[in-house]
């Protein structure tokens, strides 16, 4: 009786296996070479849609590795591959892969299984965040003008921020940088994409957080015609004089005031304490400074908005004094 010969792996599979291995290499140079090889040997225009889906699935899965080097390598490769997919296949669903399929793969490959360890769950949430960032950087959803899938991706990011508070600042930073990127590419980016970020943060009760504050300020500056929600900040401006106490509380990552109509917007959990100053402080201080500086002179343009000195007195010195009294009592 003759034995069946083992089926030899196809050359393409062997090539991909080598690329995946090098994407996880500790050497940044090796990782970049591997990403370049992936784009060269399996460029989207000459690769079947089925093969492209297999590659994208493997890249998303690689983001869930416990090795930092692997997450970095797979993240770069995924971002660049999605960019090339847009360029070579175009934004049309007929030629490329619909945004819904890409979000499906992200969701499926980065969902931790029920019986997994805490470390494995942590790795999967990191993978989900890195994957979401890769999709954002590739501009796939904007190019396909798929607002529905954009909102779906925002739900995934907000879900990470609420479920894992120690990732909340990273989630906010990715969305803040996304709004800045939108602003740089305006008017090709519709206001609806920027507005959706604010709306989803509001829906997930993350708008009155340092991250939500920074994003709101950036959206209001970059997309002045976007109709922001009315019931979050007075006059739709976090720097309104009437909101100075709330502004100070948010910047300290404290719970916001709990009047009946404000309870819905209170901060959801505190982020892990860090000696590093939150990026929202830079955003607020820069906005206050630019409000006062006109033609090289300090001029307050809007009397309804707080000045830098008032902010410093109420939000910084006031909080410090309050803490000193608390600890000395």
Each language-model region and where it sits:
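Extended alpha-solenoid scaffolds built from HEAT/ARM-like alpha-helical repeats
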Residues: 2-329
């Amino acid at each position: 009786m003759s034995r069946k010969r083992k089926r030899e792996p196809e050359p393409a599979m062997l090539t991909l296996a080598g690329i995946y291995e090098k994407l996880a290499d500790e050497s940044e140079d090796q990782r970049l070479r591997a990403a370049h090889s992936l784009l060269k040997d399996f460029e989207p225009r000459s690769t079947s849609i089925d093969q492209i889906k297999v590659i994208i699935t493997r890249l998303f899965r690689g983001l869930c590795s416990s090795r930092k080097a692997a997450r970095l390598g797979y993240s770069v490769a995924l971002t660049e591959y999605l960019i090339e997919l847009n360029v070579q296949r175009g934004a049309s669903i007929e030629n490329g892969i619909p945004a819904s399929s890409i979000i499906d793969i992200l969701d499926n490959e980065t969902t931790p299984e029920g019986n997994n360890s805490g470390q494995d769950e942590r790795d999967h949430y990191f993978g989900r965040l890195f994957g979401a960032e890769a999709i954002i950087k590739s501009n796939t959803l904007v190019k396909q003008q798929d607002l529905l899938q954009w909102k779906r991706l925002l739900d995934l990011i907000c879900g990470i921020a609420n479920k894992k508070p120690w990732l909340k600042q990273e989630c906010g930073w990715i969305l803040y940088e996304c709004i800045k990127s939108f602003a740089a590419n305006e008017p090709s980016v519709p206001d609806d994409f920027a507005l959706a970020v604010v709306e989803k943060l509001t829906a997930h009760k993350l708008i009155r957080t340092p991250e939500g504050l920074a994003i709101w300020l950036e959206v209001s500056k970059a997309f002045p015609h976007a109709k922001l929600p009315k019931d979050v900040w007075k006059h739709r401006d976090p720097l309104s004089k009437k909101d100075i106490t709330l502004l100070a509380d948010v910047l300290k990552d404290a719970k916001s005031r709990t009047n009946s109509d404000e309870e819905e917007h209170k901060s959801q959990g505190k982020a892990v304490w860090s000696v590093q100053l939150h990026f929202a402080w830079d955003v607020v201080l820069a906005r206050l400074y630019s409000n006062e500086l006109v033609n090289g002179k300090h001029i307050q343009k809007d009397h309804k908005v707080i000045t830098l000195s008032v902010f410093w007195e109420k939000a910084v010195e006031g909080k410090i004094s309050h803490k000193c009294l608390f600890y000395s009592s």
